[in-house]
Amino acid sequence: VDLDITLRNDVKVEVSGGDNAGLACGTMDENTSLAVSLSSSSLDVSGKSNAGVFVGKMSADATLNIDKCDTLTSVNISANNAGGLVGSAENAEINVGEGVTLTMTGSVTGSVTAGGLFGSYTYSKADEKTFDISKFSGMKMALACSSGDTADSAAVGSVFGVLINSADSVK
C-alpha cells in the first residue's frame, strides 16, 4: 500500500488509539508492506500500548518504506512503548528512501520504553544478530525522550527504548 499524507496550513493532527496508534497505521500485521510520504508540522500521537509517528506496532516481516518526510515540528508521542518512528516492532524492516532526510523535534514519552526511533525493537531471527543503524543516518532528530511518571521502570534511549535480540531462543 502506498500512502501520501500532506497536511497544510499548520494543521495540528491528533491521533489517539486504543492499543496501537500511528499516523499512517496503528498495527501492521505479519508480511504487510506500507510506503509512506509525509508532510506535516504539528503532530500528537498517543496510544495505550504502542505509539509512533508512522506506525504503532509492526509485526513479524512487516515492511515500512519511508519515501519522503518533511520537517516535523511539535511532535508529541506517548504510550507504554513510544518511538519517534515506531512504537514497537518485532522482526520488521524499515527502509528510508535514498536522499530522504527527516528532521523531527518534540517529545517521546513511554511509561515502559521510549526511544528516538523505536520504543521497543525485538530480533528473533537465528540468522540475524545485528541491527544496521546506518540507514537512518539522514535523520536529524531533537526529541526529548522520557519515561513519564514511572521513571524507575522505564527504558529510555536516544535510538531504542529497548533492543532485544532473542535469536538464541529461536528454533
What is the predicted role of each segment?
Residues V1-K171:
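Surface-exposed loop/turn motifs in large extracellular/passenger domains
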